[in-house]
Amino acid sequence: MATKCTKCGPGYPTPLEAMKGPREEIVYLPCIYRNTGTEAPDYLATVDVDPKSPQYSQVIHRLPMPYLKDELHHSGWNTCSSCFGDSTKSRNKLILPGLISSRIYVVDVGSEPRAPKLHKVIEASEIQAKCNVSNTHTSHCLASGEVMVNTLGDLQGNGKGSFVLLDGETFEVKGTWEKPGGASPMGYDFWYQPRHNVMVSTEWAAPNVFKDGFNPAHVEAGLYGSRIFVWDWQRHEIIQTLQMTDGLIPLEIRFLHDPSATQGFVGCALSSNIQRFYKNEEGTWSVEKVIQVPSKKVKGWMLPEMPGLITDILLSLDDRFLYFSNWLHGDIRQYDISNPQKPRLTGQIFLGGSIVRGGSVQVLEDQELTCQPEPLVVKGKRIPGGPQMIQLSLDGKRLYATTSLYSDWDKQFYPDLIREGSVMLQVDVDTVNGGLKLNPNFLVDFGKEPLGPALAHELRYPGGDCSSDIWI
């Protein structure tokens, strides 16, 4: 068990110390009603994940937002392990940006962790007036005590990868992090590594492009991203743009957790590959493809070939394993990245997806499978959709997954999700030899929510996790 410092700040001194942290007992995740037909606000659900609890795998609390149609998406903290050395800091507020509304909600999870309450609403009008941006997305806490939230658009819905700074105590909007006029053309995710004076960010598409669903013609027109932007952390400006070969729609990007590392990985959704970015011998940054998921030739789908669609990636805290989800194919994969240049597949599990046997899609040619996977049934429920957002326990032994991507795309690719709601599943992980196995006793069915089926998204543990905490 990790030793808890009584005079330290939030989180843990190192990623390896974090692995010794306590087992997760509750999980927070946003649930979305936009595009479901239910006229109710999105809400933050609290789920009990303690096997010893009588409420195990149940929603124990729901905090509705005050407005409709926010499209809650990702979440972050007011402070995390980057402030471990500051005993005045406490991880007690969850930051919830609204992808469509551009509001940012600050939720108090410190007073009653099992019953969060709304602390503050940062209105879109304040963000727009001070920063001239919209479509708030990823939130990370900084060692300065500030919170940084990136954006995807300008006020007209064009692409604009900007970074909004919030005061970590008052949550007032302070302005943008990047220099005036220095935003990237588009945005999505970001990760920083101060020891090397660098931040990296990715790009999805302009809000006008993605907001109403996926149109293949937009890909042909070059309206989706394929670049990594490398920023000077101290000067707040782009110093390099990495144009990826065969790297369409780079979404989640992660440096290795080791704060001295000079490499990481990005998941490219549409081209369905994992690319490794790294500092080269010249001191600049390079990128190379290290994993490719082959598309499947299909019949009965919107296109003749179906990509895996890698939508989320995670690194274990010891930087040994890489995990990612193929939302369309329906599997989660585990790779040993002891040699980051040559990841080795060590585990794979199918949790639904678009190619299950007996569905509307027939696979004509498959480079990996000899037959279509069976539909997943857990506790008598056939699981709709495919695995999307994933979260790993601190010790690396449990992987949680939800099945909703973004309500407009859910509606298009998995209409069953809209009718039935998404689910939360749990997979047991073999951290010795590698391997993934479903826990048949765990199911959170968001199709049975009191106000109607809901779409659950990103998962957060109260004490921090593999995708929220950055060590400096």
From Swiss-Prot:
Keywords: Cytoplasm, Membrane, Nucleus, Phosphoprotein, Protein transport, Selenium, Transport. It comes from the Eukaryota. Mainly expressed in liver. It is found in: Nucleus; Cytoplasm, Cytosol; Membrane. GO terms for biological process: protein transport. Pfam families: SBP56. One of its GO terms (molecular function) is selenium binding. The modification Phosphoserine is found at residue 467. GO terms for cellular component: cytosol; membrane; nucleus. The N-terminus is blocked. It is a peripheral membrane protein. InterPro entries: Se-bd (IPR008826). Transmembrane segments: none annotated. Selenium- and acetaminophen-binding protein which may be involved in the sensing of reactive xenobiotics in the cytoplasm. May be involved in intra-Golgi protein transport. Belongs to the selenium-binding protein family. This is Selenium-binding protein 2. It comes from Mus musculus. The lineage of its organism: Eukaryota, Metazoa, Chordata, Craniata, Vertebrata.
